[in-house]
């Protein structure tokens, strides 16, 4: 390895440099254009530093390291569309999706907001929004939801009537009202409990809302515009059980190991559940460190 004019040699190396989430051009190439002629990655926001460009991953790929994972798959969260391009952090995450409805730019629902507990689904919504026209979503709640979720740094758009809310969001008012009224009519009364998979659900509605479905009818009303927020990407180096990198053709590297997000694709294909990233880093950090030290001694 070279640092300026200095050359550093090692008997073994552990690469733990993360993904390529900050390289918008790479994201753009991976995602390509959608049917509407849009480049979805142009509307992605990066939750962390602007410097995670995947340079070590690129170098390893060029040197013959095998890869694993879909370059479009990532830990991708629905975050406030008003967040900065980089470094918005966790405070921009919108956590009220399961308490309301999520609409696209056509004022249509497009997925079950109550499918499962939030820690199992929060990193799904960014990708779902990325697949919508304009890569924009609108999370709509009413006064009943206030105080039941971690409030993001940006306040919700607040109005006293639903038509006012539609206009404030820039959505077609008649279509918005039709969507909300249809949803409200489909809600079945149950015992609301956000801590369990409760029996508040919809009937005869596509897509269904299977839990925590309550009518949006109590003023004031709130909306949060959201965009895809990329935390880390899943494309990475292929490794064996000892965290040793595998080369194209299947053979093991002589002295290269990987840990953390740069090899997360070995574990994560799509989707996410809270804490898996830290678990991958912790487990494979220990494995890679142990095996690299053993390799160097031998």
PLM regions: where:
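An active-site-proximal "capping" alpha-helix that borders the catalytic cofactor pocket
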Residues: 56-63, 277-295
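Core beta-strand elements of the Rossmann-like FAD/NAD(P) dinucleotide-binding domain
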Residues: 2-12, 251-253
């Amino acid at each position: 390895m070279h640092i300026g004019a200095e050359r550093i040699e090692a008997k073994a190396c552990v690469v733990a440099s993360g993904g390529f989430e900050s390289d918008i051009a790479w994201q753009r190439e991976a995602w390509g254009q959608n049917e509407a002629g849009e480049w979805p990655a142009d509307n992605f926001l990066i939750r962390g530093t602007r410097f995670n460009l995947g340079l070590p991953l690129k170098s390893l790929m060029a040197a013959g390291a095998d890869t694993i994972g879909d370059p479009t798959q990532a830990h991708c969260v629905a975050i406030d569309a008003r967040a900065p391009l980089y470094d918005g952090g966790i405070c921009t995450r919108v956590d009220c999706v399961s308490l309301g409805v999520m609409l696209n730019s056509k004022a249509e629902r497009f997925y079950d907001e109550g499918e499962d507990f939030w820690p199992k689904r929060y990193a799904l919504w960014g990708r779902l929004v990325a697949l919508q026209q304009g890569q924009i979503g609108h999370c709509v709640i009413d006064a009943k939801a206030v105080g039941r979720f971690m409030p993001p740094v940006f306040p919700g758009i607040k109005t006293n009537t639903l038509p006012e809310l539609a206009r404030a969001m820039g959505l077609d008012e008649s279509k918005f009202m039709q969507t909300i009224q249809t949803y409200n009519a489909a809600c079945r009364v149950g015992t609301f409990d956000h801590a369990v998979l409760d029996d508040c659900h919809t009937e005869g509605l596509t897509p269904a809302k299977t839990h925590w479905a309550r009518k949006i009818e109590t003023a004031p009303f709130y909306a949060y515009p959201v965009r895809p927020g990329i935390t880390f990407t899943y494309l990475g180096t292929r490794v064996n059980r000892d965290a040793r990198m595998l080369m194209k053709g299947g053979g093991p590297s002589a002295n290269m190991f990987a840990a953390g997000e740069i090899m997360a694709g070995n574990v994560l294909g799509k989707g996410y559940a809270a804490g898996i990233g830290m678990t991958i880093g912790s487990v494979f950090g220990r494995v890679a460190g142990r095996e690299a030290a053993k390799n160097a001694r031998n």
